[in-house]
Curated annotation (Swiss-Prot):
Catalyzes the NADPH-dependent rearrangement and reduction of 1-deoxy-D-xylulose-5-phosphate (DXP) to 2-C-methyl-D-erythritol 4-phosphate (MEP). InterPro entries: DXP_reductoisomerase, DXP_reductoisomerase_C, DXP_reductoisomerase_N, DXPR_C, DXPR_C_sf, NAD(P)-bd_dom_sf. Pfam families: DXP_redisom_C, DXP_reductoisom, DXPR_C. GO terms for biological process: isopentenyl diphosphate biosynthetic process, methylerythritol 4-phosphate pathway involved in terpenoid biosynthetic process. It comes from Pseudomonas fluorescens (strain Pf0-1). It catalyses: 2-C-methyl-D-erythritol 4-phosphate + NADP(+) = 1-deoxy-D-xylulose 5-phosphate + NADPH + H(+). Its EC number is 1.1.1.267. Mn(2+) binds at residues 153, 155, 229. This is 1-deoxy-D-xylulose 5-phosphate reductoisomerase.
Amino acid sequence: MSRPQQITVLGATGSIGLSTLDVIARHPDRYQAFALSGFTRLSELFALCVRHLPEYAVVPEAGAARNLQDDLRAAGLSTQVLVGEEGLCQVAAAPEVDAVMAAIVGAAGLRPTLAAVEAGKKILLANKEALVMSGALFMQAVRKSGSVLLPIDSEHNAIFQCMPQDFARGLSNVGVRRILLTASGGPFRQTPMAELAHVSPDQACAHPNWSMGRKISVDSASMMNKGLELIEACWLFDAKPSQVEVVIHPQSVIHSLVDYVDGSVLAQLGNPDMRTPIANALAWPERIDSGVAPLDLFAVARLDFEAPDEERFPCLRLARQAAEAGNSAPAMLNAANEVAVAAFLDGRVRYLEIASIIEEVLNLEPVVALDNLDAVFAADATARTLAGQWLSRNGR
């Protein structure tokens, strides 16, 4: 019997990480957690180490590492604790590792994910910011290393399942007319426009269908998440922004569709549970049980669709503009959004000001080419500085 595949889970204490470990635990003969990383919920990381017995755990700083190492030793575990970005890159690229779940939220996940790519690992990509920030460089690294890149976002995983196997030859060459990227519309789809100025972080995080972390929940409410997914889809499937159409589908049962030139439209359906795309990517090209209940079409009963209102969701408009501009624009969009959303969650800015901050940053800074990773992080830093200046200027 062959050994279980060794899986590094970057962002193990987040919702994607926990769902990944749930799927892994259902198939101990196939998968073993090799390394787990956590950022803030370190008591939870300790509990995960006790349950899954990884070779390594990674935490952000040395003090936390000492505390976790002491706790693990006291529990009789041999798990070794590593520190910071260097530790993340080490467990992402380790020779023993077969696949890496890249689920660290935001720009912080880029370097470890690239380390896994350059080491030729199978990449389960949940960190959409990695592609948004450095799309051309990232895909170039994938091609150079021969790494297998499998999307975890439910929408991109759905598109992947609906695409022909040889879609890398170009969408027009395989008969694809367009990608239909579905969105729930979030908690504010029908909120009166006058009330949006006063919505709270808790309201923004109350997603009607999905259980997610707070940052991505706010992105879903503003539809910036869908904008980032539009950019990600362009890189994953070599599509032009004009070939990706966003469709609001409140039930979140159809996770995305692919429209073919012969009039066929293929869709992937399922209950809104991230274990489905995770299991699909872990086992690809095979299929395994994810623990997700079968879809009951009779209970769903109806499927609704509508066009997104860009006045209600200006972040979607800004993301499409950044996708069309290319180069540094998506990286700056992402960085400005991260600063603005953090300020909103801290109660320093209002919900509608998130888009205002992003738009100002994009208008202030010219678009430049990103020829290397240093240029990517320079664009990221510039956008964060400009967003911070907006906060300071407005007394936030």
